[in-house]
Amino acid sequence: EKVESWGIKDATLVNASGLNNSYLGENIYPGTDKDDENLMSAKDVAIVARHLLKDYPEALETAKTPTKIFAEGTTSQVEMVNWNWMLPGFLNYKEGVDGLKTGTTDLAGACFVGIMIKDGQRIITVVLNATNHEEDPSARFIETAKLMDYTYANWKKEEVLPAGSRLPDMTTIKVKDGEELTTKVSLKSAVSLWVRNDMD
C-alpha cells in the first residue's frame, strides 16, 4: 500500500531484506515461494531512495560512514567496512558522494543506489546488474560515476515560476458559499525543475 501511494505500481515485493527468500529459511512471508525475490525497476528504486532520504534523513549518517567499530575495546571488537567504494578513502572515491546502498543477488547482479550533492543540488542514481562485475568489482561504481557526471554536465535545477506567480489557465477559482464567489490564485512558493542545459 505504501509504495503504491508513491506511484509504484508494478513492483514485486516479497520481503523487507532485499535478499532472495532462500536466505530467510522459515521466515519468509506467507504466500511467497522459497526462491522468490523482490523485483523493481530502476525508477522504482529511485523513488524508494528519495522517500528514505526525505522521511528518514538520519539514515544518511549511517550510509556515509566509511568504517565503524562495534564493541570497541572488548574481545568482541569488530570493524565493519562500507561496501560503497565511492566514499572517501575507497578505490572509486568521488567527491560529493555520500551514500547510499549496494546490493548483489544472482538475479539482480551488482547494483548500486548512489547519491551525490554538488553545488547544493542532490541527485539519485540507480545502476542495476552492472556489466562485467565478476571481472571488475568496481563496475557498478564506474557506471554510477558516468551517470553522475552526465547529469551535472547536462542538467540544472532552475526556477521556472517565482512565488506569487499566477497560472495562465487558473487565475481565479470558485469559492462555494463565500462572501466572494471567486478568489485569485497564486503560487505560495517558487517552483523549480531540473531542465536540460540546452533548453530555453
Predicted regions mapped to residue ranges:
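Short linear capping/connector segments at secondary-structure termini
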Residues: 15-21, 65-66
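Domain-terminus/edge residues, biased toward the C-terminal soluble/receptor-binding domains
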Residues: 25-200
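Short, charged, amphipathic alpha-helices and their helix-cap/turn boundaries
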Residues: 1-18
